[in-house]
Amino acid sequence: VRIGWLGGSSHLKDLEILSGMPGRLSTSCTGKFQFVLCGYDLRGKITEMNQQTGQQTTRDIEPHESIWYTYEKIFTENYKIVSKEYGDWLQSFKKGKYKGEEELPYRRVWTKPITTYASNYNLFDVSLAPIKEHVFNYVKSQLKVIEAGFHKKALIAQDYGPYQIDCINAVEYGGKLNSKGNCLMVETR
């Protein structure tokens, strides 16, 4: 089962909710899951200020400074769920495909032009929609629900805010299946 997330660079607090989950799944279900992180991007600039002179300089970010590197560490448990060889290749930040990556526990998908963004949904079976409880997130749209539905993907969503509008939990309290459910809703801990 391929479990994927796609989004932008402003979702660190949302993705931190997933911390520890890839490792627990990969330990208990070895070879049955793949986590797919879509949108990996190393573009960006950093502006630095010299404290003594007040002069500002702007430079390209280094790969390890990218928020996507932090996202990847969440999805790979700091590269523990992948082989050392694959982890080293990932941390070399080479664009392109790694041989056999479709069968590995984690897969990085580089950013694509906005006109082909939706094609990323073809790379996974289950869409993740974690969302941090915060007033800003409470009033967001349910875009992830709409995208998953449009692409006929199963959805695991946070039981919060915008996802409570259209999502009906497919599993009731106690584990009973809800035949009217359209999503797996997960409580924030």
Label every PLM stretch briefly:
Residues 10, 140, 184:
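Glycosyltransferase donor-binding loop in the core domain
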Residues 25-32, 98-101:
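Short helix-capping segments at alpha-helix termini
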